[in-house]
């Protein structure tokens, strides 16, 4: 019995020997050649340098910074290749302040064999790697920080994984990761960068991210707050549900990307926020391209509130239901985009707000284009109090594809500074369509053209209290249909120069025009900018002649007695750049005068001819008046002398002008090729002007003299009536008082061959009577009262050159600014000849 027991004991011991002999433990790392298998660092405050490659099939961590081993420095030069399970190239375990610098590549083949892993409790590690990390095992991450804080990782090289995420941070805070290189992953749930339940980390990457399997995101933040991610490079995903940038249940993060996002799978969104709120900010410069169905460019859903997304680039999608921008059940977000949205799939809207999303703001500078059926440019469904501004055009070509569609949505504010063009001819592709929607405000500064024959605007009977504001630039092809009753309003804010004749398809709107009268029934109004400017036109017509005659009076005040002829030519330009009140006018003319001989009191006769053109407004809200005018008169330059120390002159002028008034009229009933027409009417004006001017010289010395003049004229004008299209403008009598005060100084050179002068003046025009113009629109009488009182402040500089005793040439320039913000520059030149 005893021998039997000994026999089996010896056998057990023998069997146990091989087991004991094959069990190995990593040795302590030591400076010099790299270990053949693995080593550990278990002490503190040591610097190591290892040189050489490691190629091992161990299942241990190859180089391990052990627990409690703090403030060590390891310089590693060489490559590391491992084949075993859990065989990480470098691991850190519950330690602080260690530094790793590696130049070389890492290749692992086993499952859970990360390139670099920080186990829980690692702090203040500083990792610098120049080289690539390649893993092929399941859950073999390139770099993994697990419950570790305040570490810095810097890598120059690429990460490639087959069944794992490239860089992952789990429950880790305040880490800094810098990477120059690309990340490529294969396998399901193999993300490029993943930040899970982690806070206040900073990740910076220069390079591309590419994922090739299901639910593999480029950048993922899950349950993570206050992180900053900076990426310069492209993100590419190829399978279903693989989003480019994905935030889920994450708040107050900042993601900055310069590069493109390309997704190919079903439901693979470019930028996706789900249940993420409170000041997440995503700034992207680059394009988003999706080629899978239901793959949205920018998508916010499930209570993703109060986030900011800024994108400079284009969004392009090519499959069904692939919207450009979608906000679903999310509030108070701001999306700002500079770029275009283009979709080609059925039901692929440009911008979609849906399912109770409220108080969101979308600012877009760019165009929206859709080409498939039921693909609206902007679609609001069951959402309230949102604001959308598009500085660009919306174009749809598919059946039942509206440009702007509001359904069961209230109190939204939408501004389109561009055109809305639809071209489907099936009867349900209105540029703007509302149903079951109330109290919305829509502002349009461009075309609403239905090229397929639908209405340009259509409101169904269940929509009330909506307001459409039409700015200058708006035009319409197709009727303005309102089946919701007179609580819906059309407000025309196009300026005084706009004219329109718009059909409302037999429906009735509340109509408003912010500048002038409007006739109800259909929406009709006539531009009145020329009427408003009539007082200025009268002043401008007489002003160049007054300047010439003032100069003539100065000659007599100086004691001269001119004889012969004189000729004066001038050109003036008016402008007012005030928005919606623009004026651009040009007037040029010539005055020829002759001094009558053998008269006891000096007398001159004169004839003036002027051509002018005045443009009002811009674009489709524009008026033009062209005039040819002739004035003739008698001038008495010294009717009385030594009156209060000066001379008194008098004049009387009579004349007439032929005028052609042209208006651009918006008309939505001209077919599908044009939205406006031009109408014009000719009329004749007559003028009578009589006035006097007092002029005196003072502080006169040999070569310098000062002058002061005060003048006033009474101008009586009459415009005959005329007809232009549906507009009939009644005749108008006008009485205007023009007054002026002018100070001048003249300098003569020693040889008295050149005079140089300056002039400063204040003038006023006051319309005593006739400031109201009566007219008719399609037989309905209305009226408009124009400007009746303006001041003009002028400054001038001139020179005169004496050719001989009987001839001189002169040129004068004058700049004026009116109290109505009209600026004027006039150049005046001519000659005086005594023969």
Regions found by a protein language model. Name each.
Residues 36-42, 61-68, 88-94, 114-121, ...:
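Glycine-rich beta-solenoid repeat tracts in large extracellular/virion proteins
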Residues 140, 164, 190-192, 216, ...:
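Transmembrane beta-barrel architecture of outer membranes
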Residues 628-633, 637-638, 729-835:
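Outer membrane beta-barrel transmembrane domains
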